[in-house]
Curated annotation (Swiss-Prot):
Protein name according to UniProt: Cobyric acid synthase
Domain of life: Bacteria
Biological role: Catalyzes amidations at positions B, D, E, and G on adenosylcobyrinic A,C-diamide. NH(2) groups are provided by glutamine, and one molecule of ATP is hydrogenolyzed for each amidation.
InterPro entries in the cross-refs: Class_I_gatase-like, CobQ/CobB/MinD/ParA_Nub-bd_dom, CobQ_GATase1, CobQ_N, CobQ_synth, GATase_3, P-loop_NTPase
Gene3D superfamilies recorded: 3.40.50.880, P-loop containing nucleotide triphosphate hydrolases
Keyword Disulfide bond: no
Pathway noted in the entry: Cofactor biosynthesis; adenosylcobalamin biosynthesis
Residues of the GATase cobBQ-type domain: 248-435
Active-site residues per Swiss-Prot or TrEMBL entry: C329 (nucleophile), H427
Pfam families cross-referenced by the UniProt entry: CbiA, GATase_3
Family, similarity comment: Belongs to the CobB/CobQ family. CobQ subfamily.
């Protein structure tokens, strides 16, 4: 059994992408490999085969390994629900919410969960490919670290350090990170990968030679800047769009402070007939065909922000002029009459008035609903697949006209009597080609082009593995992975 860890000099250095690429590259070599991230902080999560939730990046990495996502792949998930606190999820299940100080004291317990998951995976797979978090050189976070070198030291694994040259200062990032590590941690770093390079590699070579001489460690390769990958962003919202047709459907997503699972909108962002715009603070909601209220980790807080920004009035105006409206998960809850949080799960306990556009109310409960689902959209009887991640229980007359008939016999969500509003708890609504096309037609798009989003993602994973083959030192990589 071999464990290899990828750490980065900064957030968004390319750790998730490199782990995905290495997983598929190893799979091509006939090696059974499994992804692992000890601790992830993200509001984008996926439901696993064993009924828990993990970061979406690990779900994509599981796809690269052709495995079903499992909670052991990301044993600690932190989902921020305020500026100073987060919901702590251990082995796929929410434990409690903590502020940063309380979580620091909890790290010893969290590390036990991390090591237990790693032990199970390493017993089942020849190679465990690990992704770190942020940077290993954050001085204020090094005590009790479980996400980077603290984990690497605990399991005694080698580390590859990746840096993003597109940011500038790549040599300072690599050398500075290395020098802030302890002597034993420095020895774990077996080589560097430089990511997102544009230009003539010959012009970079003197810098690579200097880096190897300065550190005594090899550069394992330089990966090129790639502009058109369709893989989900780990943290920030990706606003890049594909080439658009002349006649497009205008879709608006209001971005609220605790937006969750914004990867729901990636298929729309990439669709050639959809002009997707994310609207932030200080921006009015422009005229559009469709507005989508996204998921939220703090529904009542985000509702207050929505009203403060005047977006509630803009939504009412949008409906008066015949526009369509979708609410997903937290967005569904906002569309109802009331949202009650008696246990203070998402902040201070209490109740808030919803937008009152659909006749139902939601009570947040401690036990989350976590499941992968399939069913049929009430629109056009289109097949839909997705996943539920929510603590709310919603009841009311509007649910008598559901948005989705689920295969397990349950109903999900609601469609308004006038057909303008659709509410659902299902994330991943637009990933299926049938459901995406049906929803776009409902919103007013004619002659919808059917896009196979899953095929796009699979194609990009293969492209990443091709980049490993072409640009990295595969001989040294095989040695680091313990593969003959």
């Amino acid at each position: 059994m071999t464990t290899l860890m990828v750490q980065g000099t900064t957030s968004d250095a390319g750790k998730s992408t490199l782990v995905t690429a290495l997983c598929r590259w190893l799979l091509r070599q006939g090696v059974a490999v499994v992804p692992f991230k000890p601790q992830n902080m993200a509001l984008n999560s996926a439901v696993t085969a064993d009924g828990g939730e993990i970061g979406r990046a690990q779900a994509v990495q599981a796809q690269a390994c052709r495995l079903q996502p499992h909670t052991d792949m990301n044993p600690v998930l932190l989902k921020p629900n305020s500026d100073t606190g987060a919901q702590v999820i251990i082995h796929g299940r929410a434990v409690t919410s903590m502020n940063a100080v309380a979580y620091h004291d909890y790290k010893t317990t969290a590390m036990q969960a991390v090591l237990a998951s790693h032990h199970r995976l390493s017993a089942a797979y020849p190679v465990v490919m690990v992704e770190g978090a942020g940077s290993p050189a954050e001085i204020n976070l090094r005590a009790g670290d479980i996400a980077n070198m603290g984990f690497a030291e605990a399991v005694d694994c080698p580390v590859i350090l990746v840096a993003d040259i597109n940011r500038g200062g790549v040599f300072a990032h690599l050398v500075g990170t290395l020098e802030l590590l302890s002597t034993t941690e420095q020895a774990r770093v077996k080589g560097f990968v430089i990511n997102r390079f544009r230009g003539d590699i010959a012009l970079l070579q003197p810098g690579l030679d200097w880096l190897e001489q300065r550190t005594g460690k090899p550069v394992l390769g330089v990966l090129p800047y790639v502009t058109d990958l369709h893989l989900e962003a780990e943290d920030g919202i990706d606003v890049r769009q594909g080439v658009k047709h002349e006649r497009v459907l205008k879709v608006i997503v209001p971005v609220l402070p605790r937006i969750s699972n914004h990867t729901d909108f990636d298929p729309l962002r990439l669709h050639p007939q959809v002009d997707l715009q994310f609207i932030g603070p200080g921006q009015p909601i422009p005229a559009a065909d469709l507005i989508i209220l996204p998921g939220s980790k703090s529904v009542r807080g985000d509702l207050a922000q929505l009203r403060e920004r005047g977006w509630d009035k803009a939504i009412e105006r949008h409906l008066r002029y015949g526009g369509k409206l979708i609410g997903i998960c937290g967005g569904l809850q906002m569309l109802g009459r009331e949202v009650h949080d008696p246990l203070g799960l998402e902040g201070a306990a209490g109740s808030s008035q919803g937008l009152g556009l659909l006749d139902y109310a939601t009570v947040l409960e401690a036990e989350k609903q976590l499941r992968n689902v399939a069913g049929t959209l009430s629109l056009e009887a289109a097949t839909v697949t997705g996943y539920e991640i929510h603590a709310g229980v919603t009841t009311g007359p509007a649910l008598a006209q559901p948005a989705v008939q689920l295969a397990d016999g349950r109903h999900d969500g609601a469609v308004s009597a006038d057909g303008q509003i659709l509410a659902t708890y299902l994330h991943g609504l637009f990933e299926g080609s049938q459901s995406c096309a049906a929803l776009l037609r409902w919103a007013g798009l004619e002659d919808v082009q059917v896009i196979d989003y899953e095929a796009l993602r699979e194609h990009d994973i293969e492209r990443l593995a091709d980049l490993v083959e072409k640009h990295l030192d595969t001989v040294q990589l095989r040695q680091l992975c313990g593969v003959a």
